[in-house]
Amino acid sequence: MTPDPTHPHASPPAPDGIHYRACNLCEAICGLKITVQGGRVTDVRGDPDDPLSRGHICPKGAALPDLHADPDRLKTPMRRVGDHWEPMEWDAALDHVAAQLRAVREQHGADAVATFQGNPSVHNSGTLLSAGAFLKALGSRSRYTATSIDQLPHHFAGAEMFGHPLLLPIPDVDRTDFFLMMGANPLASNGSIMTAPGIRDRLKAIRARGGRVVLLDPRRTESAEYATDFHHIRPGTDALFLLALLNEVFASSLQRTAHLGGVMTGLDSLKAAAAPFTPEAVEARTGVSAGVTRELARAFAAAPRAAAYGRIGLSIQEFGGLCQWLVNALNAVTGHLDAVGGAMFPAPAFDLLAGAKAGATHHGRHHTRVRGLPEFDGELPNVALAEEILTPGDGQIRALITVAGNPVLSVPDGQALDRALGSLDFMVSIDPYLNETTRHAHVILPPAFGLEVPHYDVIFHHFAVRNTARYSQPVFPIRPDQRFDFQIFDGLVQRLTGRALATPEQRLSAGLTHGRSGLTLDDLKANPHGVDLGPLQPCLPGRLLTATGELHLAPAPMLADLPRLRATLDQPPEPLVLIGRRQLRSNNSWMHNTPRLMRGPDRCTVQLNPADAQGLEHGQTVLIRSRVGEITAPLEITDTVMPGVACLPHGFGHARGGTRLSTAARHAGASLNDLTDPTRIDALTGNAAVNGTPITVHAAEQVGESAAD
């Protein structure tokens, strides 16, 4: 779809020619070559000269022009008046929002104003480099983000083992010979907490050089096609399997700790912790045979260059924190941590750890009011948000600011949160769409985004498989009545504190100047394809930020959580549990409003193994029930999921009224999070345990034809 230049919402035309920038729609940050003719985008291709993505592009990157031209996108502030929306001028909108926030804060206290930041907050450098100052100006401890939906266990393990939440070991996939993946589907995600664009070719290259790619997952995913070995594993049992691997490593004296021996502490405690979890002890629970476990442990330990990696399937379960700790520990004790071809730490040009203090405390400094759940890195678990709004008393949340988030679809028990949002005294959303969450806002402040904004990937260079740097210039100018995200934050901060913010470009320039790469912002602007800073390099102990300067193999919180895990060995598995499903043409709840990404058959299907689908037929509508709710979805019978497992994609559920998402509404689907349970969490980290939700599946009652039919 191309914009009509006469339309009142049309953007100013872009200058004709070739434009280069990074796609910021997922973690792969692929370089793009964008052709503009007649003031509009006529072609989008992968940039072959980008040193990280090397010409790779996925369907999302090709759809960037469609997002830019989306007629449903908001560009000026909107105020809800009754059941309709009216436009506002920017100054009036910012004045009104600041006054409402100030009033709630003065009457109920700073913590009565909560914030929720969605994943796009870290995909946009303007927000990432400005939102922190806004949060500080609010002075509220009621901070919630998408982190505690799907990745908090990574950061918890990084803080406990290495001293900082952003110290996350990343697989050196381009030089490894044994890649062990668990609960990861990089063919759909393009790599997550592993920025690895073109992962298909990288996996094929491992096999081409004689290496192994081993994948364990409850579902035989798209990534399994590029694995040498695939094994089903029951949801929520990954920590048991990882302990069994460690058990075999220690029992067979396969540990290799010489290169980090003077840095690591807790080796004996880790060995003792793994002792009860023999491959035979866990095989009935995990579904992975003891023989397979022993062979994998021995082969992984013996490989000269190997990396273990666990992603979302390990994080969104009841033992996510233990899983991510054990992945790191396995790499460490086999000599594959901070080693070429193993799990390594990137060295980004703009380094968020540059000013970090060693020995800082990152969790448990305050707790939620209702359930007493601990904060981590200043954030509270999002499973508590609805109850903190709905439960009366001192500290009750009375106002909410959402930033690029749609928690009604992304947080467990979205129906409860939907009800909670309707009870707020005031809500403002910094978001370009009227979606399932922002429909509850009293004011929407839409920022410019995508092809209109300058961008540097601050976060994802910390997770990349190669050190590079790239600055993206805008393709399109914004209209006079539009605002960048940092201008919105600056306007609110000035009204709340009287102080102005530094611009993201100023902060980026300062960070680069003080970084180790020697690059300046001008250098990046002069190199539109990006700058190659080389492969990952060993960096320990210098990169560690623990109080003692050591790597902690057996942190006390992890050891204290092991009895909870051990108790599961005596518990029978649930008859049927639900897991999620990533899809290449979307990212969580994003991009369902883009027509070219929604083509083809219905993607919001529930997958069942034939053993669990007796009496049901492929394609029929089924009723799925959990403790908290029920939905209907078309049934897909497939042996790609193991028995006892149902699989449903997340991010759908666009049938709620009051939104302005015309394409998404035609592909509404059902929300997985109308089934997930906010009481199911990883007790160690507070992360939501959305995988493993017990459910039942039955044939839905016959429904009449819709009016459209």
Regions found by a protein language model. Name each.
Residues 35-41, 547-548, 626-627:
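Short acidic-glycine loop/turn motifs at beta-strand connectors
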Residues 473-528, 596-606, 612-709:
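Long, contiguous, secondary-structure-rich segments that constitute the structural scaffold
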